[in-house]
């Protein structure tokens, strides 16, 4: 079973040829949808693969699955 990250955890993920960074704001263990920059983003979250609403340093948001993220540092 996956150990979920907690709100406030700094994380990274691959974005094209780059690495993006952010901080977890909210944790979801059930399917979730959010509209980000006018696009509906969905994640099929579960206790085994939680989803996270992540804030980025420049103020943007991302909705990511646990399997997409790595703890920063």
Feature locations, PLM:
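Intrinsically disordered, low-complexity, charged/polar segments
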Residues: 43-73
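Short, conserved beta-turn/loop elements at beta-strand boundaries and strand-helix junctions
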Residues: 27-33
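Short beta-strand-centered aromatic/proline hotspots
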Residues: 19-27
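Cytosolic, membrane-proximal regulatory domains of ion/volume homeostasis and mechanosensation machinery
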Residues: 34-43
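Short, surface-exposed secondary-structure edge patches
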Residues: 1-4, 16
């Amino acid at each position: 079973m996956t150990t979920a990250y907690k709100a406030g955890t700094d994380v990274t993920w691959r974005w094209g040829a780059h690495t993006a960074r952010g901080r977890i704001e909210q944790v979801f263990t059930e399917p979730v949808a959010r509209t980000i920059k006018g696009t509906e983003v969905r994640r099929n979250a579960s206790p085994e693969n939680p989803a996270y609403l992540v804030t980025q340093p420049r103020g943007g948001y991302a909705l990511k699955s646990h399997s997409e993220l790595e703890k920063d540092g």
